[in-house]
Amino acid sequence: MLQLFYFSAIIASVILNFVGIIMNLFIMVVNCKTWVKSHRISSSDRILFSLGITRFLMLGLFLVNTIFFVSSNTERSVYLSAFFVLCFMFXDSSSLWFVTLLNILYCVKITNFQHSVFLLLKQNISPKIPRLLLACVLISAFTTCLYITLSQASPFPELVTKRNNTSFNTHEGILSLVVSLVLSSSLQFIINVTSASLLIHSLRRHIQKMQKNATGFWNPQTEAHVGAMKLMIYFLILYIPYSVATLVQYLPFYVGMDMGTKAICLIFATLYSPGHSVLIIITHPKLKTTAKKILCFKK
């Protein structure tokens, strides 16, 4: 029964990856078309375009690795597995930093704080987006290189046996993996929670101000607050289980877990990227309108 559940989780994982690939390809194409047509692109769309590319490559790599691992009956070098892991780590870290940068941009642009730091950020963050995107890539490259450097103390075995008798020494790379994930994920989590908290505080102040002025509090600024806040909260709801599931999959005791627990970890680890991509589309006016036209739901 548990084996059937685990097999179903693998099938669901493959389907979710296909959905994620299609959603991110859609995000890439729409933003690229707008960029080419108008010869300009907004800061948020630039981040979304970069995020779409990274997730498209990451999900494609994950899908190829999953299909190869499930279907292959021949022995394969563990170095190939290591290559997949390193590429996935780099692309995954980059995509998470891009989302973090997107949340920072929303927070800075939408909140109405009059502090000098916020005013300075409002004026200067948009021109700095290309450099900040490059910084996200460099940080991801650093954490990936850190993993490689620390794992050199525990060299990989020569071969991984056939899929029905696969055995990994999970203790060998666990320290380097945990350090790399914690260094990157902790800072991302703190920044995203802070951005969401500032948005909530700004929304509360805005509503109180509108109520004092005896005017309706639901206006374009309120709508922008709520839309960005929903996207951030949904991101955190998907991101926290994803981070835990991803880390658990590489812990030493994961090999001894039952099939049911492994299946749950696999589903949570796979759900984040496609789920968040769908949320981006349905909360982004231009992407949502284009999606409705494609699906023939235009009124």
Curated annotation (Swiss-Prot):
<feature type="topological domain" description="Extracellular">
    <location>
        <begin position="68"/>
        <end position="81"/>
    </location>
</feature>
<feature type="transmembrane region" description="Helical; Name=4">
    <location>
        <begin position="132"/>
        <end position="152"/>
    </location>
</feature>
<feature type="topological domain" description="Cytoplasmic">
    <location>
        <begin position="103"/>
        <end position="131"/>
    </location>
</feature>
<keyword id="KW-0325">Glycoprotein</keyword>
<feature type="glycosylation site" description="N-linked (GlcNAc...) asparagine">
    <location>
        <position position="165"/>
    </location>
</feature>
<keyword id="KW-0812">Transmembrane</keyword>
<keyword id="KW-0966">Cell projection</keyword>
<feature type="topological domain" description="Extracellular">
    <location>
        <begin position="252"/>
        <end position="262"/>
    </location>
</feature>
<dbReference type="GO" id="GO:0004930">
    <property type="term" value="F:G protein-coupled receptor activity"/>
</dbReference>
<feature type="topological domain" description="Extracellular">
    <location>
        <begin position="153"/>
        <end position="172"/>
    </location>
</feature>
<feature type="transmembrane region" description="Helical; Name=1">
    <location>
        <begin position="10"/>
        <end position="30"/>
    </location>
</feature>
<dbReference type="GO" id="GO:0060170">
    <property type="term" value="C:ciliary membrane"/>
</dbReference>
<feature type="topological domain" description="Cytoplasmic">
    <location>
        <begin position="284"/>
        <end position="299"/>
    </location>
</feature>
<keyword id="KW-0472">Membrane</keyword>
<feature type="transmembrane region" description="Helical; Name=6">
    <location>
        <begin position="231"/>
        <end position="251"/>
    </location>
</feature>
<feature type="transmembrane region" description="Helical; Name=2">
    <location>
        <begin position="47"/>
        <end position="67"/>
    </location>
</feature>
<feature type="topological domain" description="Cytoplasmic">
    <location>
        <begin position="31"/>
        <end position="46"/>
    </location>
</feature>
<keyword id="KW-1003">Cell membrane</keyword>
<keyword id="KW-0969">Cilium</keyword>
<feature type="transmembrane region" description="Helical; Name=5">
    <location>
        <begin position="173"/>
        <end position="193"/>
    </location>
</feature>
<keyword id="KW-1133">Transmembrane helix</keyword>
<keyword id="KW-0675">Receptor</keyword>
<feature type="transmembrane region" description="Helical; Name=7">
    <location>
        <begin position="263"/>
        <end position="283"/>
    </location>
</feature>
<feature type="transmembrane region" description="Helical; Name=3">
    <location>
        <begin position="82"/>
        <end position="102"/>
    </location>
</feature>
<keyword id="KW-0297">G-protein coupled receptor</keyword>
<protein>
    <recommendedName>
        <fullName>Taste receptor type 2 member 4</fullName>
    </recommendedName>
</protein>
<feature type="glycosylation site" description="N-linked (GlcNAc...) asparagine">
    <location>
        <position position="164"/>
    </location>
</feature>
<feature type="topological domain" description="Cytoplasmic">
    <location>
        <begin position="194"/>
        <end position="230"/>
    </location>
</feature>
<comment type="function">
    <text>Gustducin-coupled receptor implicated in the perception of bitter compounds in the oral cavity and the gastrointestinal tract. Signals through PLCB2 and the calcium-regulated cation channel TRPM5. In airway epithelial cells, binding of denatonium increases the intracellular calcium ion concentration and stimulates ciliary beat frequency.</text>
</comment>
<dbReference type="Pfam" id="PF05296">
    <property type="entry name" value="TAS2R"/>
</dbReference>
<keyword id="KW-0807">Transducer</keyword>
<feature type="topological domain" description="Extracellular">
    <location>
        <begin position="1"/>
        <end position="9"/>
    </location>
</feature>
<comment type="similarity">
    <text>Belongs to the G-protein coupled receptor T2R family.</text>
</comment>
<dbReference type="InterPro" id="IPR030055">
    <property type="entry name" value="TAS2R4"/>
</dbReference>
<dbReference type="InterPro" id="IPR007960">
    <property type="entry name" value="TAS2R"/>
</dbReference>
<keyword id="KW-0716">Sensory transduction</keyword>
<keyword id="KW-0919">Taste</keyword>
<dbReference type="GO" id="GO:0033038">
    <property type="term" value="F:bitter taste receptor activity"/>
</dbReference>
